Regions:
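Basic, helix-initiating cap at the start of DNA-binding domains
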Residues: 1-41, 45-54, 71
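Alpha-helical structural segments
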Residues: 25-36, 40, 54, 71-94, ...
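Short coil/turn segments at alpha/beta junctions that flank glycine-rich nucleotide-binding fingerprints
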Residues: 40-44, 114, 153
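DNA-binding alpha-helical recognition surfaces that contact promoter or target DNA
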Residues: 50, 64, 74-75, 166
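Short hydrophobic/aromatic patch on the recognition helix
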Residues: 56-66
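Amphipathic alpha-helical packing segments from all-alpha helical-bundle domains
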Residues: 102, 128-166, 177
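Hydrophobic alpha-helical segments that form the core
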Residues: 106, 110, 157-181, 185-196
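Amphipathic alpha-helical segments used for helix-helix packing
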Residues: 108-130, 177
Length: 200
């Protein structure tokens, strides 16, 4: 009896592990499909039906993870804000010129690891924003903190961390998109960002 009981527990554990793996795989497919479609058409321009068709999953599977497409968009966006904050935290305490280089590296690294999500940050609408507001504000606060470090070295072209934050919001990601397929993407992006933000 004991052997049969142990075998049953092992079988149940195996089934649970397989179910967990399947759920994780399905969620990842929804995230990838949503990220691609949202980046191409905007969040408002994509329906749940289009997401599940792209992911090749059922409507029931979608709603098992997300209440609506705004929750899906938030799940795509939150990791990029978290990763960005973690990267910016590593720049604290660096000399101003190294912080400036590290800031550009942060944008380039995020582009490599969270490209579609990064593209969405510029098209967040009023329906999605409440889902990611706290992380968005925290990222901007961390970014401003690093810009203030750079400002302390009298390096900012406009002499203002706050104004440079606005410049980055308008140009940081669009420039990544522009140079994305260029053979010298990293060099051109770095040179462009330095020209926009840092004194010669």
């Amino acid at each position: 009896m004991m052997g049969a009981s142990n075998a049953s527990r092992r079988a149940n554990a195996s089934r649970r592990a397989k179910a967990a793996y399947r759920d994780s795989e399905h969620r990842e497919r929804l995230l990838e499909a949503g990220a691609r479609l949202f980046a191409l058409h905007g969040i408002a321009g994509v329906s749940v039906a289009e997401v599940i068709a792209q992911a090749d999953l059922s409507r029931a599977t979608f709603y098992g993870f997300f209440a609506n497409k705004n929750e899906l968009a938030a799940a795509i966006l939150l990791p990029v804000f978290d990763a960005g904050q973690a990267a910016l935290a590593k720049l604290e305490g660096l000399p101003p010129h190294k912080a400036a280089d590290g800031l550009i590296d942060t944008y380039l690294d995020l582009w490599q690891t969270h490209k579609n999500a990064l593209l969405l940050t510029g098209i967040i609408d009023s329906e999605v924003f409440p889902y990611i507001a706290s992380q968005h504000h925290a990222f901007n606060a961390a970014l401003l903190k690093i810009l203030q470090v750079i400002e302390s070295g009298d390096l900012l072209r406009n002499n203002s961390a706050e104004l440079t934050l606005e410049v980055l919001a308008k140009t940081g990601i669009p420039l990544l998109r522009i140079y994305n397929n260029h053979d010298h993407m990293e060099r051109l992006y770095r040179e462009s960002m330095l020209a926009l933000t840092i004194k010669v």
